[in-house]
Curated annotation (Swiss-Prot):
Official protein name in the record: Dephospho-CoA kinase
Sequence ranges assigned to domain DPCK in this UniProt record: 6-203
PROSITE patterns noted in UniProt: DPCK
Pfam families: CoaE
Function: Catalyzes the phosphorylation of the 3'-hydroxyl group of dephosphocoenzyme A to form coenzyme A.
PANTHER family for this protein: BIFUNCTIONAL COENZYME A SYNTHASE-RELATED, DEPHOSPHO-COA KINASE-RELATED
Location within or outside the cell: Cytoplasm
Length: 203
C-alpha cells in the first residue's frame, strides 16, 4: 500500500477553509478531518477535558443543557492569552491523537486535514503539503463579524490571537485566494489539486 499523502488546509479565521475542504470532498472524494470538529468532540459533556474546563471556570461556563457555552468561553480565552494557552494545552494533544488515528486507518491515497492553528500549534510535521486559504484583512474582519455575530473589538481579538496571515502565506506551499466568486476559488483548488503528488507548488 502506498504512503498516505497528507494535505494540510489552514489560513486565517473566516477565510474559507471549510469551503475548500467541502469542495475537495464533493469533487474528488477526498476524506476530510476537521480539527474544529474534533475539538468540539473532545470537550463533549462527560469527557475529561470538559470536566477540566468546568473545574477551572465553574458551572457558569455551561449552557442549560450542560454543554459548554462556546461564546462565553471565547470571551474569556481571547481576552486572556494565558487562559487561551491553558485551554489549547488541554485540547490540542487530544485533537492531534484523533487526527493520527484517522490517518492510520485511512485507506485512501490522500487525506486532507483542516487545521486552523496548524502553524501556531507547530503541526507542520503532521502534513506533507500545506494550502493556505487567504483573503484581504478588511474582508476577513467583515466575514468574521457576520459569521460569528461579533463586535469589531471581539473579532479583532480573535484575529490577533493567530499568526498574521502574511506569515502563514510565507510558509505555505500553495496559497488559495478567496477574494471573488466561489467558482474562482474552486478553479484554484482544481489547479492546486492537480499538482498534488507531483511535488508541485502553486499560488
Amino acid at each position: 500500500m502506498s504512503r498516505l499523502l497528507r494535505l494540510g488546509i489552514t489560513g486565517g479565521i473566516a477565510c474559507g477553509k471549510s469551503v475548500v475542504a467541502g469542495y475537495l470532498q464533493r469533487q474528488y472524494g477526498v476524506p476530510i478531518v476537521d480539527a474544529d470538529v474534533l475539538a468540539r468532540q473532545v470537550v463533549a459533556v462527560g469527557t475529561p477535558i470538559y470536566q477540566a474546563i468546568v473545574d477551572r471556570y465553574g458551572d457558569g461556563i455551561c449552557r442549560r443543557d450542560g454543554t459548554l457555552d462556546r461564546s462565553r468561553l471565547g470571551e474569556i480565552v481571547f481576552a486572556q492569552p494565558q487562559e487561551r494557552q491553558w485551554l489549547e494545552a488541554q485540547i490540542h494533544p487530544a485533537v492531534v491523537a484523533e487526527m493520527e488515528q484517522a490517518m492510520a486507518t485511512c485507506d485512501q491515497p490522500l487525506m486532507a486535514l483542516v487545521i486552523p492553528l496548524l502553524f501556531e500549534a507547530h503541526l507542520e510535521g503532521l502534513v506533507d503539503h500545506i494550502w493556505v486559504v487567504a483573503t484581504p484583512p478588511e474582508q476577513q474582519l467583515a466575514r468574521l463579524q457576520q459569521r460569528d455575530r461579533l463586535s469589531a473589538h471581539a473579532a479583532g481579538q480573535r484575529l490577533a490571537s493567530q499568526l498574521p496571515l502574511e506569515e502563514k502565506i510565507r510558509r505555505a506551499d500553495t496559497v488559495l485566494w478567496n477574494t471573488g466568486s466561489l467558482e474562482e476559488l474552486y478553479r484554484q483548488v482544481d489547479q492546486a489539486f492537480s499538482l498534488l503528488g507531483r511535488g508541485g507548488k502553486g499560488g
